[in-house]
């Protein structure tokens, strides 16, 4: 049994399309890789996870996956198509239906606690210099926080690690 949850609405902002699974001890990252999305993200259990659909599916013997398309604040037709293709790709690979599509990505498996949060030191308008899924180096300028009243730069935001912009 498989449970596929299209969950993008629960995370605000833009992010790399990925499959997310709570680490219950019953998760299967190898099955999650069959969606062909660039990343499979596992996360340690938090108190509220016990009330989520995917957690309860997994605990009760269903292979459960949350598919995050990459956009929540707007309708992005291209990202929606990629999410639909990922689900159809998975169902085809599991022998449930036949659908012709490209192979997708070889997924990188990452754990949520390996993601590094970068925060601004001041409030204001954000001027981004990098985009989602862009590779960055430690110390690289990611953006600036601008004073909304006079346009002055209040703060610079720099990468604290080498990697990609995930969220």
Which residues does each predicted region cover?
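Structured catalytic-domain cores with a bias toward divalent-metal coordination
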Residues: 1-167
């Amino acid at each position: 049994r498989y449970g596929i949850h299209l969950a993008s609405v629960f995370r605000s902002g833009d992010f790399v399309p990925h499959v997310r699974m709570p680490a219950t001890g019953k998760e299967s990252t190898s099955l999650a890789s069959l969606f062909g999305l660039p990343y499979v993200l596992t996360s340690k259990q938090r108190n509220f996870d016990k009330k989520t659909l995917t957690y309860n599916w997994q605990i009760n013997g269903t292979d459960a996956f949350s598919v995050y398309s990459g956009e929540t604040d707007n309708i992005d037709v291209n990202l929606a198509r990629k999410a639909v293709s990922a689900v159809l790709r998975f169902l085809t690979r599991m022998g449930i239906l036949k659908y012709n599509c490209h192979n997708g990505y070889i997924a990188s498996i990452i754990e949520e606690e390996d993601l590094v949060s970068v925060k601004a030191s001041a409030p204001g308008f954000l001027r981004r210099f990098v985009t989602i899924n862009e590779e960055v180096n430690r110390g690289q300028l990611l953006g600036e926080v601008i004073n909304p009243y006079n346009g002055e730069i209040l703060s610079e935001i720099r990468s604290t690690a080498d990697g990609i912009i995930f969220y």
